[in-house]
Amino acid sequence: MEPRSRRRRSRQLVATFLRDPGSGRVYRRGKLIGKGAFSRCYKLTDMSTSAVFALKVVPRGGAGRLRLRGKVEREIALHSRLRHRNIVAFHAHFADRDHVYMVLEYCSRQSLAHVLKVRRTLTEPEVRYYLRGLVSGLRYLHQQRIVHRDLKPSNFFLNKNMEVKIGDLGLAARVGPAGRCHRVLCGTPNFQAPEVVSRNGHSCKSDIWALGCIMYTVLTGTPPFAAAPLSEMYQNIRDGHYLEPTHLSPSARSLIARLLAPDPAERPSLDHLLQDDFFSQGFTPERLPPHSCHSPPVFAFPPPLGRLFRKVGQLLLTQCRPPCPFTSKEASGPGEEGTEPDHMEAGNEERDPLCTEGRIHLLTLGTPRTGLAGPKGSLALQLEVATRKLFLCLDAGPMAGQDPPGEQRPVLWAPKWVDYSLKYGFGYQLSDGGSGVLFRDGSHMALRPQGGHVSYQPDQGTLWTFTLRDVPSPLRAKLAVLRLFACYMQRRLREEGTVPMPATPASPDISLLSFIADSQAMVMLFSNGTVQVSLKTSQTQLVLSGEDEDLLLTLQEPGGPAVGVSYTLDVLRSHGFTLAVHHHLRHGLHLLQSV
């Protein structure tokens, strides 16, 4: 038998310079960047163009390698025909006496497994981003009647632009006429579907099960099925039995449960997967910063400049019926990132004054406060003001073992919101009964509870106020979105019995300037200077209102007084506040300083 050390040396004997006999290209082999059970991967440079690739090297030769040789030939036959932005590109292949070489796309950010090794867990916006790319690539594979059979984080690669690519098609196979592959047990045990464990064969739905395992893994840091011994884990897989991650959002837990349905027929299709509330209710970044490979990104949502509201305007103006009343799917608000309202439907619900149809006449034309409509200084100024308020509170007093004596003062805050910023905008409801939407193009529209007035302010523009009798046709699309959000949030507040105590009515020009969020909290900045810090896990709200010595910190907690408990600066200086409040304020400050 060949000594182990000698076998190890023979596996490493890959020449520094390699020539493709078919094309005549000469490559220089670089450092080792990855290895698997039967292959190794190196950085590769084309000597004539300096283009950089990844080189997958599979040893050949020996009677025991016949089966492996067949797998390599199948991998080349399948992979070389694939062309998709979310699948690692296959450029060329050649062989010599000792090895088979595959020249592949080079992904400089390594794999998702490398990211997880450093990060341990990912935020839900990141998971949405990665899953969208994976679903796109996997849909293309399935359209080619190919099942991957080994989907896992180490087989998802990231290029320099943080685009995710499906790679390593060593176990991929074409499905037969019945939609299944041969009944073999292959793949990584933690990610195998019940039908695979039961040796009923892989299908496209087996890959979808693997997506559920991947989603669970990147959100929690551990696979859903990781018990020892192997027989126990396989039984848990057959039963679909796993520890439910209660710290995740309800929509994330729901989608994981759908993906990990033991019956393949109950798992969603790839098209239906992207329509799930997990995607429609929360923010999905268009791209991720490179530093997210080693540290959590902070997502800031300042009003974008210069964007037009084309798509939403066309959709609602041409396709939607009269918008009220509405029905909706789920609640949205503190502790969640917002749920998607249903399309506009007629129903038998109580008609709300905010939803009444009618003609709208222009009431007033005015200019908003100085600085609110400024081009670039507005957000920076508001961030500075908000940061100063948080510092005032943090510096006010010592730590306390219990809450200081407070009083109940009605303050203006947002008890409910709907984050649909990817398509329409960010909708919110105020405690005085008013509501507003910060649209993607930076404009703002609000419904005021006094007389049902509508105020509209385009990005860097003047403030317009209307009555509910007439509206210019260019604004009907935005008004439809606003009224949908308003009715949706008001209905959810009534159903949950969490209608806040009425606050002093806000001025007509109050608007949401910006919101900043990460996986744990959200900070909302309003044009009247109010700063709201919302904690997603505890559903606690910290509202900072007033200026300088008149600053008021109001604490809104589930089960607490409907109007909240407010503390003046003098009270905070003399009594201090608890460690939890201090932590929440610090987190809000961190979000503001990260923009």
Swiss-Prot record:
List, as start-end ranges, the regions of compositional bias called Basic and acidic residues: 340-350
Please list the GO terms describing molecular function: ATP binding; metal ion binding
Q: Where is the active site?
A: 150
Q: Where is this region: Disordered?
A: 326-350
Q: Tell me a GO cellular component.
A: nucleolus
Instruction: State its location(s).
Output: Nucleus, Nucleolus; Cytoplasm
Record InterPro entries: Kinase-like_dom_sf, POLO_box_1, POLO_box_dom, POLO_box_dom_sf, Prot_kinase_dom, Protein_kinase_ATP_BS, Ser/Thr_kinase_AS
Q: Which residues form the Protein kinase domain?
A: 27-279
**Changing residue 417 to A: what effect?**
Induces cell cycle arrest
Induction of expression:
Down-regulated in proliferating cells or in serum-stimulated cells or growth factors. Up-regulated in asynchronous cells, or upon serum deprivation or following stress inducible DNA damage treatment.
Under the heading Pfam families, the entry gives: Pkinase (PF00069), POLO_box (PF00659)
The effect of residue 150 to A is:
Induces cell cycle arrest and neurite differentiation
Cystine residue pairs: none
- GO annotations under biological process? cell differentiation; cell division; defense response to tumor cell; DNA damage response; negative regulation of cell population proliferation; positive regulation of neuron projection development; regulation of apoptotic process; regulation of G1/S transition of mitotic cell cycle
Cite the binding residues for ATP.
33-41, 56
Q: Which residues form the signal peptide?
A: none
PANTHER family referenced in this protein's UniProt entry, alphabetically: INACTIVE SERINE_THREONINE-PROTEIN KINASE PLK5, SERINE/THREONINE-PROTEIN KINASE PLK
Function of the molecule? Inactive serine/threonine-protein kinase that plays a role in cell cycle progression and neuronal differentiation.
User: What is the name of the protein in this document?
Assistant: Inactive serine/threonine-protein kinase PLK5
- What gene name is listed for this protein? Plk5
